[in-house]
Amino acid sequence: MSLQSIKYSRGSLEILDQLLLPGQSKYVVVRGVEDGWKVINKMQVRGAPAIAIVGCLSLAVEINPEDFENKKSLRQEIEGKLNYLVSARPTAVNMKIAADELITLANELYKDEAIDVTQMKHRFLDATEAMLKKDIADNRAIGANGAQAILQRVAKAGKTTAGTTGSVRVLTHCNTGSLATAGYGTALGVVRQLAELGKLEHVYCTETRPYNQGARLTAYELVHEKFPATLVLDSMVAALLRAKNVAAVVVGADRVASNGDTANKIGTYQIAVVAKHHDVPFYVAAPLTSIDLAIPGGDHIIIEERPDREMTHVGEHRIAAPGINCWNPAFDVTPASLITGIITERGVFKPAELKEAITKLLES
């Protein structure tokens, strides 16, 4: 059974505090939007899909007990609070897309004279809760599509491991599993599907400095699932791909531009460069909500920069020389030219065909 990072019932929201993992499993109560903004900004919850779900559900929890005088006041509350939540971590596009969808819904409900303010509130709550269920279903579809794509490609290339009946070794970066989504995971969902098919020989995960999401979170999930797994340092990736017959790299995404350029956790770009050198397929696994067709390329993606302390300290212990300057971008952008395919819940697309394909899907 996969881990549960989000516990929700109408009027109640708790998130697994990922800052405490793997040493302690503790749930934090989110009572409203201010709590939601804080747990996202402090990275107690992280992962683009999970950020969107927690942000929207924090608003649902806040407005659930309230009695609004009229539909206008409810609409204003929804729009203002959602725009505020987007500011918690701006690189991840999922929160912005979810906010835009819910604001559009609120405006439509506001104009609908057939419903009153109470009905409007309940329709809004239903919509936010539907996002939670959809995320899990989308992740399972991503897992199935990704596993199929990897197995088909490596079978053609003859990169399955001898004597393992078509099983593969894969590498992943950061955390993209149940802890980063509503459940199952994106890139780690692909790994999970390979395991369910009996086709996962081994998974390697990077430590993912400076926040150590790979060492703290992905390793935690892999041990929990009892998958055959090995943790490697970020600086070991080139040696790993040269020595260990890795069949594919699969990572997540915080924002994908319309040309396929992908913003993901810092370190992703260099892994893609190394994978290209070693002729290892490099896949991005992301829901359609992570694809931003309004952005033409990666140069237009805003990259969040984090505090120096995340680099200079581990917990309360300083590991860097006092007085040293730090540069700590949370994400980098991998050019589309390094990406083999973008795995979504609706299929796997080459970066060059992404914009046209997604536009058609959204119009259908």
UniProtKB/Swiss-Prot annotation:
Active site per the UniProt annotation: D254
Location, primary (coarse class): cytoplasm
Pathway the protein contributes to: Amino-acid biosynthesis; L-methionine biosynthesis via salvage pathway; L-methionine from S-methyl-5-thio-alpha-D-ribose 1-phosphate: step 1/6
Pfam family, one: IF-2B
Domain of life of the source: Eukaryota
Annotated GO MF terms: S-methyl-5-thioribose-1-phosphate isomerase activity
Record organism: Drosophila sechellia (Fruit fly)
EC code(s) of this entry: 5.3.1.23
Localization, UniProt: Cytoplasm; Nucleus
A GO CC term attached to the entry: nucleus
HAMAP family with a match to the protein in the record: Salvage_MtnA
Record-stated family: Belongs to the eIF-2B alpha/beta/delta subunits family. MtnA subfamily.
Function statement: Catalyzes the interconversion of methylthioribose-1-phosphate (MTR-1-P) into methylthioribulose-1-phosphate (MTRu-1-P).
Name the UniProt record assigns to this protein: Methylthioribose-1-phosphate isomerase
Gene3D superfamilies: translation initiation factor eif-2b, domain 1 (1.20.120.420), Translation initiation factor eif-2b, domain 2 (3.40.50.10470)
Example GO biological process: L-methionine salvage from methylthioadenosine
Main EC class the enzyme belongs to: isomerase
Residues of the site described as Transition state stabilizer: C174
